[in-house]
A protein has these predicted regions:
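Helix-boundary/low-complexity linker signature
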Residues: 1-214
Length: 214
C-alpha cells in the first residue's frame, strides 16, 4: 500500500517593511523640501523661518509614514492639518495666498515691464505665515502620496509645475530643483515595493552630486 505524501507548506518569509517606508519617507521629504524652497523664493519678504516650514512638512510626512507602518495610526495624517487650522484659524490663508500670487505678479511686471492686474488684498505678515504653514502641510501630504505610490508622472508634473512657476515668477532657485529631481530619480530607481538596492542608492547619490555641480 502506497503511503500518501505529506506536503508541508512553509509560510512565506516576511519582509521587513521599515527600510522601504524609510526610503519612501526620504523621497517625500526631498520632494516637499524642494517645493517649499521654490515657494520660499517666490515671496517678496520672508514670512516664516525656513526651518519652521521644513519642520511642518517633515512632521506631516512622518505622520503619513507612521500610518503606513501601523494601520491603527492611519489617522495621523490629519493631525498637522488640524494643528494649522487651530493655530491660524484659517482666516488668513486666503489673503496670504493672494499676497503670494501678488508677489509673483509684481516681480513679473518689474522684470518684463508688464501691467498684470494684482489682487485687491491687504494681507498681514500673520496671513502670509498662515498660508505658508498650510502649504507646508499640503505639500507634505502630496509629496507622500507621490512617493508612496511611485507616481513618476505625477512627480514629474509636480517638478514641472514648480519650475514653470519659478521661471514666470522670477524666483528660480537651483537647489530647490536639485531636491525635486533627486526625489524623482530616486522613485525611478526604486522597485515596486518601494525598496532600493545599495547600487540604486549609489546611483541616486551620484545623480544628486551631478545636479549640484551643474
Amino acid at each position: 500500500m502506497e503511503q500518501s505524501e505529506i506536503l508541508r507548506y512553509q509560510p512565506a518569509e516576511k519582509t521587513n517593511p521599515y527600510p522601504a517606508v524609510a526610503w519612501t519617507l526620504l523621497l517625500a521629504v526631498l520632494l516637499s523640501g524642494g517645493a517649499l524652497l521654490a515657494m520660499e523664493h517666490l515671496w517678496a519678504t520672508e514670512v516664516l523661518p525656513l526651518m519652521r516650514v521644513f519642520a511642518i512638512a517633515i512632521v506631516t510626512v512622518v505622520c503619513c509614514a507612521a500610518g503606513k507602518c501601523n494601520r491603527r495610526l492611519s489617522f495621523l495624517w490629519i493631525v498637522p492639518l488640524l494643528f494649522v487650522f487651530i493655530t491660524t484659524g484659517f482666516r488668513g490663508c486666503p489673503s496670504g495666498g493672494m499676497a503670494w500670487i501678488n508677489d509673483m505678479l509684481s516681480r513679473w511686471n518689474s522684470l518684463h515691464e508688464d501691467g498684470l492686474a494684482l489682487f485687491s488684498c491687504n494681507a498681514s505678515l500673520r496671513d502670509r505665515a498662515a498660508f505658508a504653514s498650510l502649504m507646508a502641510v499640503l505639500t507634505g501630504l502630496l509629496a507622500w502620496q507621490i512617493a508612496a505610490g511611485r507616481r513618476l508622472y505625477c512627480g514629474s508634473a509636480f517638478c514641472l509645475f514648480w519650475l514653470i512657476l519659478s521661471l514666470l515668477g522670477g524666483g528660480f532657485f537651483p537647489p530647490a530643483f536639485v531636491l525635486l529631481l533627486t526625489s524623482v530619480f530616486g522613485m525611478m530607481l526604486s522597485d515596486h515595493a518601494q525598496g532600493i538596492s545599495g547600487r540604486g542608492m549609489v546611483w541616486c547619490g551620484g545623480i544628486a552630486i551631478v545636479l549640484c555641480l551643474c
